[in-house]
Amino acid sequence: MVNPTVFFDISADGEPLGRVSFELFADKVPKTAENFRALSTGEKGFGYKGSSFHRIIPGFMCQGGDFTRHNGTGGRSIYGEKFEDENFILKHTGPGILSMANAGPNTNGSQFFICTAKTEWLDGKHVVFGKVKEGMNIVEAMERFGSRNGKTSKKITISDCGQL
């Protein structure tokens, strides 16, 4: 089985920054990968298109995926509001790792983050399910609009997304 690839076209205050593509590790975390894939295509009638990265901390990560409240308190999975931690096989080994944001054990919804550094303290707490395939330079460009408290200086949005 070939792991799926999805893309995000990223904008800053409506100006295109470029495309980031992700390999989703469906071979290791099929349920988590399928959630992200389906939210990227919007095939269930809801998903990431038009949503923003509400929290960007340079040297740490870019967090997005709250397409219901747009502030980090919302989002939902394709399985219902929340779903369980599938496993912690994969680790936060460095920049480009794609992992699920959560509010404690078994609270995965749609929020995710892209690591911009090694974040091993998140191992065993957040489910890693993919990695940046192409466009890490775009993630680095997004990072420049972040701050230490996570507030962004420009609105960083997913203007388009889907499966490749």
UniProtKB/Swiss-Prot annotation:
Any one of the GO CC terms: extracellular region
Function, as annotated: Catalyzes the cis-trans isomerization of proline imidic peptide bonds in oligopeptides. Exerts a strong chemotactic effect on leukocytes partly through activation of one of its membrane receptors BSG/CD147, initiating a signaling cascade that culminates in MAPK/ERK activation. Activates endothelial cells (ECs) in a proinflammatory manner by stimulating activation of NF-kappa-B and ERK, JNK and p38 MAP-kinases and by inducing expression of adhesion molecules including SELE and VCAM1.
Localization (cell): Cytoplasm; Secreted; Nucleus
Domain PPIase cyclophilin-type residues, every copy: 7-163
Residues where N-acetylvaline is found: 2
Glycan-carrying positions: 108
Subunit composition and interactions: Interacts with protein phosphatase PPP3CA/calcineurin A. Interacts with PRPF19 isoform 2 (via N-terminus). Interacts with isoform 2 of BSG/CD147. Interacts with FOXO1; the interaction promotes FOXO1 dephosphorylation, nuclear accumulation and transcriptional activity. Interacts with integrin ITGA2B:ITGB3; the interaction is ROS and peptidyl-prolyl cis-trans isomerase (PPIase) activity-dependent and is increased in the presence of thrombin. Interacts with MAP3K5.
Protein name per the record: Peptidyl-prolyl cis-trans isomerase A
Organism: Cricetulus griseus
Regulation: Binds cyclosporin A (CsA). CsA mediates some of its effects via an inhibitory action on PPIase.
Family the entry assigns: Belongs to the cyclophilin-type PPIase family. PPIase A subfamily.
Transmembrane spans: none
UniProt crosslink position (Glycyl lysine isopeptide (Lys-Gly) (interchain with G-Cter in ubiquitin)): 28
Location of Phosphoserine modifications: 77
Catalytic activity field: [protein]-peptidylproline (omega=180) = [protein]-peptidylproline (omega=0)
Residue numbers bearing the Phosphothreonine modification: 93
Pfam families linked to this entry: Pro_isomerase
Alphabetical UniProt keywords: Acetylation, Apoptosis, Cytoplasm, Glycoprotein, Isomerase, Isopeptide bond, Nucleus, Phosphoprotein, Rotamase, Secreted, Ubl conjugation
Enzyme Commission identifier(s): 5.2.1.8
